[in-house]
Structures are given as C-alpha cells and as structure tokens.
C-alpha cells in the first residue's frame, strides 16, 4: 500500500499575502469549504495574532470545517500561541504551526538571540502549544541559510518536545531541486529521532522551482507538502497544489506515495480562488489553465482523436474540466436556489443576504438562458465584496461610436446622496472610470484592469478585476455583469469601497 502524502493548503494564509489578494472572512470560509470538499488534509486558515480580522477568520473556518484539520500560524511566543489556541478551540481537529528563525543572520540581527536561546525558545513554544493540541508543527524560518549542524540540533529538540511535523521552508525560492531533496535526506539521516515526525516542505517559486523542489523533497522522504491553489502567494507565489497532486497521481510508477485529493474538485477550486482574489489563471497554466488540454497542432489533434493517450497524460474530466453543471433558470424558485448554494458550500449569514443575491440571480436569468455554478460563485463574490457600500452605482450610460470620442455618464450614490458626472475617454471603460473619479476624487492609481468570461457563450457574464493603489495600500475590486462596461464600473467602485472602509480586513495590505 502506498504511503500517504499530506496536502497542507496555505491559500488562506500565505496565498493571501499576494498584494491585493486580501479576502473577507466570508470568502475565506467559502474557500475552506471547497478545500474540504476536495479532501485537503490540513487547511492553514491564518495568523490569529496578526489582527482581529485574522483571528475571527481562523475561528470562522474552524467552525465551518469538520473533516479537514484546521491550522493556525503562531510565532514561537506564548501570547501568539494562546491567541491561536483560542481561535481554534471551537474545533477538535486542529493544529498549531509555530516557527522561529534559525539562520545566523536572523538570529543575530532580527531576534538578537544566541543559538542556545533559540533552541530553548523553540522547545518552550512547542510545549506551550501542546496545551491546546497534540498536533503541533514546527518551522525553522530561513532553513536554507541555516547551518546544518544547528538545524539538526533544533529539529531534534522540538521532536523531543512533542512536534509531530517538521516543516522545512525554502523561503526565498533559491534552492535547486537536487540541493533541496538532499537537504531533506540529510536531515532525516542525521537526526536520531527523525522517525517520530513527518517532514514537510514549503517552497516558494522565485526561480520557478517550487513544484520541482517539493517533488524532489517527496522523493527524499518528505510526506507533507505545503502549497496553494493556483500557486497563489507573495512575489512569484508558492508551490501549486494542483501541480503537486497531479504530478504524484499521474506518475504513480515513480512516486512511493499518493494523496487523498478528489481531483475532480481541482478546477472548481481554481476558479473559486481566482474569482475571489481577482488573480486570473494564465491560459497555459498546467492543469487549470484554459489551454491545458487544448490541441491546435493538426498532428496532435489527429493523434488524440485516434488514441487519447498519444498526447494526453491525464484526462481533463479527472481534474474537473467540463463539470460546470447547468442548473437553474428564470423559473427557478428560492428553495432551489438556496439548495444549490448549499451544495456549492456557500453559506449566507442572513435571509436578507439571500434575498439580495436571489434578486440579482433573477436579473441575470432574464439576461442569459443558462446559469452555471460559476455564475453563482460570481454573484455571491460580487455581493459580498464589502460589508457596507459607501459608493453604489445607480445608473450608467456609455456611448462609443466609430470615429467619435467615447463618453460616459454615471450616477452614484455617495453616502446618502446622489451625484452624477459625465466624462470622455479613450474608450467607454476609460470614460466610465474618469466620470467616477470626477465624483469621488479618490486620487488612486489604477494598477490592473482584467476581464474574464465566467462561462462560455456570447451571453456569458464578464468578470472584471480592478486593482487600485493609494498611499501604499493595494486592493482588488470585482464586478460581474453581462455588460462589460457595467461590470467595470462595479469593480472600480468595489475597490474604492474597500479603500474607504475602516473595517479591518482579514489580512490588511498596508
């Protein structure tokens, strides 16, 4: 029987550190439910000591999830660990992940601690965490620049203290696959009690090697991989969950282990995370990109038609492509609508919220004949972008005529009053944004404007992502509509609402 490879998803914690990827508590819960549906072993829900918002989000995920282990991150400090334990206490199946830096440069310049003091602090942290759960994970931060002898001492000590998982991070994505795999092998061979803990890896993608390094570690004895949906993460991202899982699943002739992931849930998870964060998936992205299973070459097409395995090493349907179920229409009632949301793992906190989204669903059903799961996710994401709308689009009239300068007239509710403006621009979207700015005068910098179709067909909803920056704060706004200009205006106002809101986000981008 194959050994079990633990999949530890950190989309909600490390993935959220991408600039602009901040999620609301409700969005974190939706993603967590999808991860649980997929069969993810451990869900790292956040860093409870970082902010009140992060604490509440971790607690909400712990309340919502029952099958996957819910994990919270904590520095090797009693106060951090207590806060994490408090957030997780609503669930019995939990883990505390604690860490401290072990490289000479970090110990000297950041911690201002001697090596012996660091070991003592690590031991105390693990023992303190075990007051809340026996499932404790320890990470030596900046392990790649740590001295191997000292690293072995620290890890041996925390195993004796009760750590069940040892996570080795490649924090800046600098290591080569042979090096990283060799490091895992060396640690397992040199640490006397290494058989009492699972070795884990957490690789970043700065050189495009996060997945390769993770798989090399697996071949050298690691039995947990920390990863994110779509490889989401700060800088160049983390190891992509979908690539790790499908590499191991597809090459069972090569790997001595396998995961328990339901791979048919991979594409739905990818689309959900992309829609919530506003980070589109590149078309040629492995597994989840739109072109991942497309063949344009005549020779390739002929081969696939004659025998699929000539050019396809896995089936598109095995990872969830083609699973966008046609479900509802203009005659569907509230009960059917509520039931389908529940099946998708979407929980709404009030009847008022359900009514608001149901009305938008009815409006959408009048515009397009076929409503898919992706449309429902987009409706919910669009409605839940900000708890309190300070700016709301009331009407939009955009004109674009060949040979003429495009213009737009917008009417926006600002607080309790209505304001309107007209502006010209290089296109109808530009004119719309300029008109909005005449009213808001927000002095923001537009960093990203992206349009994606949610489903196929000319009547499909378009989902627009707008990224704005102001005074060092970066936010994403989303808008969905069958009218791209309207979706663009909604997205811009969604981002402006986030900038205006004084509510604490689950991971503030300051």
UniProtKB/Swiss-Prot annotation:
Q: Name one GO molecular function term.
A: acetyl-CoA C-acetyltransferase activity
- The residues listed in the UniProt record as binding Mn(2+), with positions renumbered to this chain, are 14, 202, 204, 238
Pathway, according to UniProt? Amino-acid biosynthesis; L-leucine biosynthesis; L-leucine from 3-methyl-2-oxobutanoate: step 1/4
Q: What is its EC number?
A: 2.3.3.13
Question: In which compartments does the protein localize?
Answer: Cytoplasm
Q: What class of enzyme is it?
A: transferase
- Name of the protein described by the UniProt record: 2-isopropylmalate synthase
Gene name of this polypeptide: leuA
């Amino acid at each position: 029987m194959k050994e079990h490879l633990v999949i530890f998803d950190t989309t909600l914690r490390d993935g959220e550190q991408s600039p602009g990827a901040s999620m609301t508590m409700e969005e974190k819960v939706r993603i967590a439910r999808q991860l649980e549906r997929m069969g993810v072993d451990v869900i790292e829900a956040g860093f409870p000591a970082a902010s009140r918002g992060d604490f509440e989000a971790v607690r909400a995920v712990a309340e919502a999830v029952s099958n996957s282990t819910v994990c919270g991150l904590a520095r090797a400090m009693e106060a951090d660990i207590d806060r994490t334990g408090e957030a997780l206490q609503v669930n019995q199946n939990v883990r505390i992940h604690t860490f401290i830096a072990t490289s000479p440069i970090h110990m000297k310049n950041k911690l201002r601690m001697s090596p012996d003091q660091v070991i003592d602090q690590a031991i105390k942290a693990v023992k303190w965490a075990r007051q809340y759960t026996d499932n404790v994970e320890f990470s030596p931060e900046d392990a790649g620049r740590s001295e191997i002898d000292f690293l072995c001492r620290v890890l041996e000590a925390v195993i004796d203290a009760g750590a069940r998982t040892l996570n080795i991070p490649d924090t800046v994505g600098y290591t080569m696959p042979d090096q990283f795999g060799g490091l895992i092998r060396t640690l397992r061979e040199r640490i006397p009690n290494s058989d009492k803990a699972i070795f884990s890896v957490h690789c970043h993608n700065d050189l495009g090697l996060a997945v390769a390094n993770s798989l090399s570690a697996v071949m050298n004895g690691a039995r947990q991989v920390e990863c994110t949906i779509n490889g989401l993460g700060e800088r160049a991202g983390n190891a992509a969950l979908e690539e790790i899982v499908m590499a191991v699943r597809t090459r069972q002739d090569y790997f001595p282990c396998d995961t328990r992931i339901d791979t048919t849930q991979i594409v739905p998870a990818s689309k959900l995370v992309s829609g919530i964060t506003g980070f589109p998936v590149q078309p040629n992205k492995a597994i989840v990109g739109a072109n991942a299973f497309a063949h344009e070459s005549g020779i390739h097409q002929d081969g696939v038609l004659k025998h699929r395995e000539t050019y396809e090493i896995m089936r598109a349907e095995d990872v969830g492509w083609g699973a966008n179920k046609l479900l509802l229409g203009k005659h569907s009632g509230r009960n059917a609508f509520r039931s389908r949301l529940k099946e998708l793992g979407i929980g709404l906190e009030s009847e008022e919220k359900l009514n608001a989204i149901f009305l938008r669903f009815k409006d959408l059903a009048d515009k397009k004949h076929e409503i898919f799961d992706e449309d429902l996710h987009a409706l919910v994401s669009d409605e839940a972008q900000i708890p309190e709308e300070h700016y709301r689009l009331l009407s939009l009239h955009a004109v674009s005529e060949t040979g003429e300068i495009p213009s737009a007239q917008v009417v926006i509710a600002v607080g309790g009053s209505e304001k309107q403006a007209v502006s010209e621009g290089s296109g109808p979207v530009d004119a719309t944004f300029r008109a909005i700015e005449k009213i808001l005068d927000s002095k923001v910098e537009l960093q990203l404007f992206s349009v994606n179709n949610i489903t196929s067909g000319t009547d499909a909803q378009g989902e627009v992502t707008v990224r704005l920056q102001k005074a060092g704060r970066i936010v994403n706004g989303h808008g969905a509509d069958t009218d791209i200009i309207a979706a663009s205006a909604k997205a811009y106002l969604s981002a402006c609402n986030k900038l205006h809101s004084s509510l604490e986000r689950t991971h503030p981008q300051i």
